[in-house]
Structure formats: structure tokens, C-alpha cells
């Protein structure tokens, strides 16, 4: 379900807060505004594909920037849960990056693979190159290319 279809004014208010938060330079200020947007989402929050997934993913991103990967993971998993019926490759890639930073390479690869299957390289293009390098290397290790003889 999309909040915009049920209450477009509230959805616009939440979107305005997210846009405002993205313009702020202080991580603490960005987090405070994103949490304010989160608190405006009607309960049960996970019933709304949007704005729940984008707000939760945005909050996750702030925690990721702060280096608090455990909390970032909690939020990105909420974003994924809200998107169960409509997956989003960019959130898969974000989850992969967080798992990577937590040292959970199995889950990192799993989510990078989901992102790649959906949109190929595109979601990786917004992230540090190390995630793409990891994904390519792990994919090759798991599925070695057969060398052709000339």
C-alpha cells in the first residue's frame, strides 16, 4: 500500500521532510528530521511500501555514514520488509554494503546478488568501488568461468 493513495497531504509532508533532511550537512540534524518523518508514518508502518521503505532506508544511510552499522542494519531490514511485495534493487545493494561493513560476507554477497539480478551494475554505481570489486570476485569464486582452448 502507498500512503500517497490514502493521504496525499501527509505523504507530501513526509516527502518534504526527507528532502529537507537531505539538504542538511550535520548528520545529527539529518537524522532528527528523518526520524520526525518516520514518526509521521501511520501505524502499522510496515503496511506502507512507501514512504516506509524510503524513510527507513534514509535513516539507515545516516547510521551507515556515522559508522554505526548495527543500527544501520536494523533500519535497512525494515526498509526491505516494507518492500517484500515490491523489491527494490537499490535497497538490496544498501543491505549488502552494510553486511559487508559488518564482516558478514555471506549476506553481503546474497544482497549484492539480488541487486545485480535486478538492475545489473546500476545500484553499485552509487557506492564505493570496493563493493563491486567484492561482488565480482566472490561471483567468480563461486562460478568460475571456463577457459576456452584455442
Question: Which residues are covered by each model-predicted region?
Answer:
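Flexible helix-coil transition and linker loops at the boundaries of alpha-helical arrays
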Residues: 2-8, 39-50, 80-88, 122
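Structural signature of alpha-solenoid helical repeat junctions
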Residues: 12, 29, 47-51, 87, ...
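Residue-level detector of the short coil/turn that links helix A to helix B
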Residues: 25-28, 67, 103
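Alpha-solenoid helical repeat scaffolds
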Residues: 35-42, 77, 113
Amino acid at each position: 500500500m502507498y500512503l500517497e493513495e490514502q493521504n496525499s497531504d501527509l505523504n507530501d509532508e513526509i516527502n518534504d521532510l526527507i528532502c529537507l533532511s537531505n539538504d542538511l550537512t550535520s548528520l545529527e540534524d539529518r537524522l532528527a528530521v528523518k526520524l520526525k518523518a518516520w514518526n509521521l508514518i501511520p501505524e502499522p508502518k510496515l503496511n506502507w511500501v512507501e514512504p516506509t521503505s524510503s524513510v527507513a532506508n534514509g535513516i539507515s544511510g545516516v547510521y551507515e555514514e556515522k559508522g554505526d552499522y548495527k543500527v544501520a542494519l536494523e533500519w535497512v531490514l525494515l526498509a526491505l520488509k516494507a518492500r517484500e511485495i515490491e523489491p527494490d534493487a537499490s535497497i538490496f545493494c544498501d543491505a549488502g554494503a552494510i553486511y559487508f561493513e559488518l564482516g558478514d560476507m555471506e549476506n553481503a554477497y546474497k544482497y549484492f546478488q539480488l541487486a545485480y539480478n535486478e538492475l545489473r551494475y546500476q545500484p553499485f554505481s552509487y557506492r564505493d568501488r570496493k563493493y563491486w570489486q567484492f561482488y565480482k570476485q566472490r561471483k567468480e569464486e563461486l562460478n568460475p568461468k571456463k577457459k576456452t582452448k584455442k
